[in-house]
Amino acid sequence: GEDGTIQGLLELAKIPYVGCGVLASAVSMDKLYTKIIVDGLGIRQAAYVPVMREQLADMDRTVSRIESRFSYPVFIKPSNAGSSKGVSKAENRAELEAGLREAARHDRKLLVEEMITGREVECAVFGGGSEEIKASGVGEILAAADFYDFDAKYYNAESKTVTDPELPGDAAEQIPRAAAAIFKAVDGYGLSRVDFFVKADGEVVFNEINTMPGFTA
């Protein structure tokens, strides 16, 4: 319900709804297009290599292109999928090939990203349109797994979020500003949750924006 299709249906039916419109929902659901927008803002994010499903027919060439860019480990993601479905971490070539095939089950556009070592944090954003955009304080995700995958989000009771964590440098001030800028750039309205990593030196790295956050938020 957050990729713009339901929003478009509601608009055609002239039914009011809460949250982002068609454009913001569709763009934010597509990780590749979100990255292109965030690149334009000059906000740091994980380096990435886009891969199309049809390129997996020549797996050796595709994997070699990725390996020429990144060292292991890397993360593989479908461009359009929520709740971390189809996301995997690869420590070697065999795991990368398996991860690409799994991600391709969920979407024809894939992303392979460098691994960012840091704390996972999130920031809520409200407003948009004619209203002032306001960002919340920062929450930190304490995942009970190697990374915050589908099972860690929904099935592992050890995963939790803490509010107002102590962060290095001026990360706590940077994050709300960056979250509001990204929300505005995708034409957000109503509410969204913007996720980041914070590295040990205080550097803030954008992860993704969720225009209709789940109950883990």
Where are these predicted regions, by residue range?
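Short glycine-rich anion-binding loops that position phosphate/pyrophosphate groups of nucleotides
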Residues: G1, S79-A81, M212
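A short, GP-enriched loop/loop-strand-helix hinge that lies immediately N-terminal to
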Residues: G1-M29, R44-M52
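Glycine-rich phosphate/pyrophosphate-binding beta-alpha loops
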Residues: S84, I141-A144, N210-A217
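Phosphate-binding site of ATP-dependent enzymes
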Residues: E91-D170, R177, E203-V205
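Active-site anion/phosphate-binding pocket segments in diverse small-molecule metabolic enzymes
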Residues: G137-G139, A178-A185, Y189
